[in-house]
Amino acid sequence: LREIFIVLLIDFYTHTHVGKENPGVITYVEMSTIDAQTSENIKMVIERDQLAEYLAAPVSGGQKDAKEGELLILAAGSERSYEKCLGDFEKMGKQSWLMGPECKNATDAKMALQIMMGGQAALLAECLSFCEYAGVDEKVWFDVLDKGVMMNPLLRSVGNRMFKGVENNRQWPQTLFQTYLQQKDLKLAIETAEKVHCEVPVTAAVHQRYVKASRKGHANEDFASLRDAYDEKKK
């Protein structure tokens, strides 16, 4: 008997198939970045067929965080299901939160994090492109940024990867988080925003930059390849 079954996939049909193929699971934990409706649909199938209790628990963090047990886990569901999973969450992540009883409490919070992540990377790429076109030394400017209050671990990591990709003939094969995944997450965020009648003009503009990066051949490369979406002169 598996007391907890953790899933991190991207399509609805695979999720439900996995649930049906693993009867006897007490708690089914959905850790993918999906929208609230998809999460609710999976929950409906899992609980309708009495396969398990359902806990939405999308994660924030990259491959390095996953390997080192440093993920941030945003859960939503019953307190009982959440408490059952705490031991596993403590091994997988740096911290976990019970965001509320409904799937959307976790999925929408994760969307907001992806908006922040995607937006910061886009703004950094835009700043570096501006420096290049204006004749400012990009690396010196980045060093200035690095010494100030605006720097954070995400910008530092993405910025360094942007420089490496430019030096590597504008290719970013070493992938920490793929461009198409960030593009997908922003699209989900925009669709969710429309449903709740929230304006997200900045996110919509940022999403188009990721679309452009994908069209330039960077879909399966690291999302630091967004640097190339701001450059028409060089390839």
Question: Where do the protein language model's features map onto the residues?
Answer:
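Rossmann-fold dinucleotide-binding core
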Residues: 9-14, 27, 32-115
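Residue-level signal for alpha-helix termini/capping positions
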Residues: 13-20, 47, 132, 194
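Short phosphate-engaging motifs
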Residues: 4, 38, 80-81, 123, ...
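Short glycine-/small-residue-rich Rossmann-like dinucleotide-binding loops
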Residues: 1-3, 33, 77, 120
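Alpha-helix boundary/capping residues
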Residues: 4, 8, 15-16, 46, ...
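Short, flexible, mixed-charge acidic loops at enzyme active sites
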Residues: 7-17, 156-165
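Short acidic/histidine-rich motifs immediately flanking catalytic phosphotransfer sites
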Residues: 21-26
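Helical "substrate-binding/catalytic lid" subdomain
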Residues: 105-233
